[in-house]
Amino acid sequence: MPTMHAIIPVAGIGTRLRPFTHSLPKVLVNVAGKPILGHILDSLVAQGVTSATIITGYKGELVEDYVTSNYTLDVTFVEQDEMLGLGHAIWCARESLGDAPVLIILGDTVFDVDLSVLSSRQFSSLGVKYVDDPRRFGVVIEEGGFVSRLVEKPETPVSNMAIVGLYYISRPTELRNALETLIANDLRTKGEYQLTDALQLMVDRGEKFTTFSVDGWYDCGKPETLLQTNRFLLTKRNAMPAAPQGCVFVPPVHVDPSAIVEHSVIGPYASISKGAVVRNAIVRDSIVSDAATVSDIALDQSIIGENAEVTGRFSSINIGDASIVRLSQ
């Protein structure tokens, strides 16, 4: 795929992922051994993206530190100082909307998609997926092979083709003009400047949009969907770490080399992150974050935050950063 610039909005607070987002921005929450944003950037870099604009907000300095410490991408950081919708976020990055095509990709969703399908596209294109209940998503209606209408979170379903958060914009200046119209005329939907409204305005002005199918679409916005994403990412891995003496690893798992695991059964679908300590425990279908301690316990479908400590009995729990929990029998 020819080199492409990516625009990645990551400003959201992540209220549905509390307590983990009390101390971290949502995109830095750990899944399968690294932050959500790390998996997204890894995929973009592997597919030829060489530069990006990252739109930060809540705890944006932590995002900047993570990206600059771990990636050599040419990255520009732009702050969204008010949470006024996705359209407003992209407007904050309007200097990146020039003549060359751009890829807008949401920073809290992991995709399994071959972006090379976009390189030969003459027109802008939206990633879509069929869903049973479209009321939580923006949706598209197509006529004659092109998008004719976009609707943000329709109360009455008009289409089951959900917009998943991947937008290939072949003429970014047209998007910039549409966003400028929304902002200048204070055109909001449900109190926010919606990107779907800007795209609809482009369609109304004659811009052509096609769609492309995205089968692998993994939301990281809630604890249960974060665990689903963890399962998917672990399943994709071929490497299996060797279990220390006295331990059993049931694939697929991720165990960071710096983690200490003693007398434990890990997996399936378990992630043990950097500096974590697991002793006398069973951990399955769970995420144990950096420097967390888990002992004398069986965990299932749980997320343990950074520097948290959990001991006790069989449980399904979500524990925020730096917490200490001792469960009695």
Residue ranges and their predicted role:
Residues 14-19, 135:
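Short N-terminal binding/cap micro-motifs at the start of the first secondary-structure element
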Residues 28, 139-142, 211:
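A structural signal for short hydrophobic beta-strand segments in well-ordered beta-sheet cores
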Residues 13, 108-109:
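Active-site metal-binding loops of divalent metal-dependent hydrolases
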Residues 110-186:
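Conserved core of the sugar-phosphate nucleotidyltransferase
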Residues 181-329:
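Left-handed beta-helix
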